Swiss-Prot record:
Catalyzes the NADPH-dependent reduction of N-acetyl-5-glutamyl phosphate to yield N-acetyl-L-glutamate 5-semialdehyde. One of its GO terms (molecular function) is NAD binding. GO terms for cellular component: cytoplasm. Its EC number is 1.2.1.38. Pathway: Amino-acid biosynthesis; L-arginine biosynthesis; N(2)-acetyl-L-ornithine from L-glutamate: step 3/4. InterPro entries: AGPR_AS, AGPR_type-1, NAD(P)-bd_dom_sf, NAGSA_dehydrogenase, Semialdehyde_DH_NAD-bd. It comes from Xanthomonas oryzae pv. oryzae (strain MAFF 311018). This is N-acetyl-gamma-glutamyl-phosphate reductase. NCBIfam families: argC. Keywords: Amino-acid biosynthesis, Arginine biosynthesis, Cytoplasm, NADP, Oxidoreductase. The active site is at 136.
């Protein structure tokens, strides 16, 4: 069966996530990249910045109306938080049937948008045209908490450490290797956007304390969970194994996963299940690549599901 080529454009392509998106699109047999928008790189060949893409397309500096005028079948918005609305409004007006996937926080609380964490929200992708990609930490938190959600006796406490690519490309203390050297930088220790996101999605309060580390990519999340009743390690491990048995991107491991082993990989590792005396407090560790499963890979899963393709197409 011949599958018709679907056109796609990326807005905000200079960033780390944009680069990963270009690689995935280049590997996709059914997608044709028709525009890549970046003010800073306008006029330069995409292939000069991304070896995975070898065609002649050049970066363009496109405002919202120019993006809408391209009339692509799919548009992925990889913009900093607070910048998506003009693009969405222009697409809504010009080509409402365009599939829009937004990677920012801007629409994660909007009930008109589908919240796309496939392993937990796979049920109703068909026909969706507006999909909000979860946050990187929010993805790790939800996947770690969900198998024990019905057993919680109080708010999970989540201690997160991310590589500095999570702070984007705009210079700041949180992506300055000199300031991060031999350092761990805490920030937004209460009311972080991902804390609110996870609390809203799971329907329980969650406490989250993020930190930035000197490595470039990858998240380690250590989650402390209090349980209503004692459970054995085997019972807890079985909950994770059964919940994610059919999820190829989620690997349940025995020991606590290392962030160095997940960097550059598309999936999530969850493990290191450790019980405190009394078996009513458990600690679980998750790792994922913030640029991949925390952003670009998840966007590609969402795209594939919304268009009725195999979920892992282009995800090697």
């Amino acid at each position: 069966m011949t599958v018709q080529t679907t056109t796609i454009g990326i807005v905000g392509a200079r960033g780390h996530t944009g680069s990963e998106l270009i690689k995935l699109v280049a590997a996709h047999p059914h997608l044709q990249l028709v525009f890549v928008s970046s003010r800073e790189l306008a006029g330069q060949r995409v292939a000069e910045h991304n070896q995975a893409y070898q065609a002649e397309l050049r970066y363009e500096s496109l405002d919202a109306n120019a993006v809408a005028a391209k009339a692509a079948d799919v548009v992925i918005l990889a913009l900093p938080n607070g910048n998506a609305a003009p693009f969405v409004a222009a697409i809504d007006a010009a080509t409402p049937q365009t599939l829009v996937i937004d990677l920012s926080t801007d629409y994660r609380f909007d009930p008109a948008w589908y919240y796309g964490l496939p392993e937990l929200t796979r049920g109703s992708y068909a026909g969706q045209k507006r999909i909000s990609n979860p946050g990187c930490y929010a993805t790790a938190m939800q996947l770690t908490i969900a198998p024990l959600l019905d057993q919680l006796a109080g708010p999970p406490q989540c201690f997160g450490v991310s590589g500095y690519s999570g702070a984007g490309t705009t210079p700041s203390d949180k992506n300055n290797p000199a300031l991060l050297a031999d350092n761990l930088m805490p920030y937004a220790l209460t009311n972080h956007m991902h804390e609110r996101e996870v609390s809203a999605q799971l329907g329980v309060p969650v406490e989250f304390m993020p930190h930035v580390a000197p490595h470039f990519r990858g998240i380690t999340l250590t989650v402390n969970l209090w349980l209503q009743q004692p459970l054995t390690r085997e019972q807890i491990q079985a909950r994770y194994t059964q919940r994610y048995a059919d999820e190829p991107l989620i690997e349940i491991v025995d020991e606590a996963p290392w962030v160095s082993r997940i960097a550059g990989r598309h999936g999530v590792q969850i493990g290191g299940v450790t019980l405190a005396p009394g078996n009513k407090r458990v600690v679980v560790v998750a790792t994922l690549d913030n640029l991949l499963k925390g952003a670009a890979t998840q966007a590609m899963q969402n795209l594939n599901l919304a268009l009725g393709w195999d979920e892992l197409t282009a995800i090697g």
